[in-house]
Amino acid sequence: MRSAQVYRWQIPMDAGVVLRDRRLKTRDGLYVCLRDGEREGWGEISPLPGFSQETWEEAQTALLTWVNDWLQGSEGLPEMPSVAFGASCALAELTGVLPEAADYRAAPLCTGDPDDLVLRLADMPGEKIAKVKVGLYEAVRDGMVVNLLLEAIPDLHLRLDANRAWTPLKAQQFAKYVNPDYRARIAFLEEPCKTRDDSRAFARETGIAIAWDESLREADFTFEAEEGVRAVVIKPTLTGSLDKVREQVAAAHALGLTAVISSSIESSLGLTQLARIAAWLTPGTLPGLDTLHLMQAQQIRPWPGSALPCLKREELERLL
């Protein structure tokens, strides 16, 4: 006997979270809880403003329609990426497809003061990998900060994310301030330039490896082995169903590329599922999930070791 519940939620964000020149004051989303007999599965649907094609309101309409169809016995999935991902996660939990084992390691994220990152890395066991957002300030400053971090921590490897912020000139200004001896320890730089061709040229000219992120969601993108391209960064909330995520990971691995499962600033419930997906599909690769500290609360399922308060399902607004 199938049954389902849908919850709507809103989490206050820390001041200073900016996405595409727009301050994110709250993170808004939905949960779906599916039941079939004794089994239960949860999924999170939280379109990311400025990045997702769909709005939160559109996702809510699509989710409620899909849940009603599922209750009638339908087996299909919705079209919208965030809804398809959340629904497929709930189904994967319900059927036991999504393993429980999780990779709760996360590459620490530096969005501001590099001194904070140095302190966090000092306590990090094993392989030291961190992520730094670049392109928010002057390219020269970004280059100096990256150089400083690589110089200060000799066993550090950095993942950088520019979100296509730079012109070729700005990208070259960044590279100019990174010691060529340190560039090999830049694991990859996500989408440095506004176009893929400019990003490819940057990789060839500087020896700094790049990764595709936004490109994966463009209609003309194909998986290819290319000089200077080392990785793909997969954000499941923006990608679609769990099957589509699996297909992209498999396509990347077949070409010898690193596939990194990455957060779209999901709640703790969504992040714990991403940690399980990472352990399952990309074992041995540190996922990019260090975004919980941007929020003021957790929900339903806490992230291990987090001191943030965790809301229970009874405290959320139920829609169905």
From Swiss-Prot:
Pathway terms, separated by semicolons: Quinol/quinone metabolism; 1,4-dihydroxy-2-naphthoate biosynthesis; 1,4-dihydroxy-2-naphthoate from chorismate: step 4/7; Quinol/quinone metabolism; menaquinone biosynthesis
One GO biological process term: menaquinone biosynthetic process
One Pfam family per UniProt: MenC_N
InterPro entries: Enolase-like_C_sf, Enolase-like_N, Enolase_C-like, Mandelate_racemase_C, OSB_synthase_MenC1, OSBS_N
Alphabetical list of SUPFAM superfamilies matching this protein: Enolase C-terminal domain-like (SSF51604), Enolase N-terminal domain-like (SSF54826)
Keywords of the record: Lyase, Magnesium, Menaquinone biosynthesis, Metal-binding
Catalytic site: 133 (proton donor), 235 (proton acceptor)
Cofactor annotation: a divalent metal cation
Matches recorded under Gene3D superfamilies: Enolase-like C-terminal domain (3.20.20.120), Enolase-like, N-terminal domain (3.30.390.10)
Enzyme class (EC, first level): lyase
Keyword Lyase carried by entry: yes
Keyword Lyase: yes
Catalytic activity: (1R,6R)-6-hydroxy-2-succinyl-cyclohexa-2,4-diene-1-carboxylate = 2-succinylbenzoate + H2O
Residues engaged in binding Mg(2+): 161, 190, 213
EC number: 4.2.1.113
GO function term, MF aspect, one: O-succinylbenzoate synthase activity
HAMAP family in the record: MenC_1
Family note: Belongs to the mandelate racemase/muconate lactonizing enzyme family. MenC type 1 subfamily.
Function recorded in the entry: Converts 2-succinyl-6-hydroxy-2,4-cyclohexadiene-1-carboxylate (SHCHC) to 2-succinylbenzoate (OSB).
Protein name as it appears in the record: o-succinylbenzoate synthase
Name of the gene: menC
